[in-house]
Amino acid sequence: EVVAALASEHHPWAKSTLEVLAKRSPLMLHVAFEQIRRARGMTLEDELRMERGLVRHCFHPHHLNRRAGQTETAEGIRALAVDKDHLPRWEPAALTAVTAEMVAPFFVSPWPSWAHPLREL
């Protein structure tokens, strides 16, 4: 819906924003959008706990049946800083291929509440 709204605009800002979004990981765009939606109703402390879990999942994607080197984060770093080809191979490659089932596990805390690193906020 965000992409469709931007595409319907004729303002240069909308066009440049679409160009930037087209270069980003479709999966992580969905995760970021879901994060914003969820954070609206959270306390700052709970939002920071959610954020910490997201960071963990970005580097340790066991919930996606991937190894640490197979993350969108690692792929973005590879394309930008290691190989410098600026051609990330996102998985999935299209926004329309991302499912709710791919996004939801990012929001399951890797820790029980009593063991969360930010439990005392």
Regions found by a protein language model. Give the residues of each.
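C-terminal alpha-helix plus adjacent terminal tail
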Residues: 1-121
